């Protein structure tokens, strides 16, 4: 299947990366290489681009799409939480910019057998990296009712979390829930008809929650930002695109922590932590897509871009 993904906030990202022709730049979520190609085009033969992705299909597609720039490009098949370790493996110890687009690519959503979409029936999977064994099937069929309630509430921000979890546990007592279609049916039964009439698809929030849990999406964000900052040259920038409030809050807080000086409790008269500010925040408020972009690519509607610069 053709790996198709419309890059979100493309011009805004490239502009905010402040790309130097001979710099070293990392795309943590290469996907279809839309952002990546624009970065690579701005590099000279002395520059270097490193693209990360945990989806082997994305790596294959990116290699094709960036083949004309082969001499200045390297690929890493890994989760971006390993950014520091993986870069060290290829002899890269300092970088000049990092980009991460935290959305699920439209390719993954559209490829039915990956199990990301609530619009198509498929095995319950949702693994970004198919080398991992843990899948959506395990979450849906082995988590306790309390555990399901917690992730649907925390990661999906769904008001019906408790009821959805209860219905899932009751349904799987008869037989395992094996497909996305079966899960959607359970969710629809759990949410009262009146509540289903308004708002997004009733399964949207639960699917988001399970996907985040399967791929530990929130757990890896802060580590990646901290590690990227630790190897960033002065003036280098970290650009992160998020798609829901949980991710955005994590990025905002990670930037805030890196930008702050002393973090000692207020009652201490003298600083004990010796923490110094590592970055300055470029975007006090996130950059949002234009109305024109939303019209062309409705999936960009919830995107937010935050930027920090190493000092």
Swiss-Prot record:
Compartments it resides in: Cytoplasm
Single annotated GO MF: rRNA (cytosine-N4-)-methyltransferase activity
Stored InterPro entries: RsmH, SAM-dep_MeTrfase_MraW_recog, SAM-dependent_MTases_sf
Entry EC no(s): 2.1.1.199
Catalysed reactions, semicolon-separated: cytidine(1402) in 16S rRNA + S-adenosyl-L-methionine = N(4)-methylcytidine(1402) in 16S rRNA + S-adenosyl-L-homocysteine + H(+)
UniProt keyword list: Cytoplasm, Methyltransferase, rRNA processing, S-adenosyl-L-methionine, Transferase
Coiled coil start-end: none
Keyword Phosphoprotein in record: no
GO-annotated cellular components: cytoplasm
Entry annotated with the keyword Kinase: no
One GO BP: rRNA base methylation
Residues that, per the record, bind S-adenosyl-L-methionine: 33-35, 53, 80, 101, 108
Top-rank taxon: Bacteria
Function, in words: Specifically methylates the N4 position of cytidine in position 1402 (C1402) of 16S rRNA.
PANTHER family in alphabetical order: 12S RRNA N4-METHYLCYTIDINE METHYLTRANSFERASE (PTHR11265:SF0), S-ADENOSYL-METHYLTRANSFERASE MRAW (PTHR11265)
Family under the similarity heading: Belongs to the methyltransferase superfamily. RsmH family.
Protein name as catalogued: Ribosomal RNA small subunit methyltransferase H
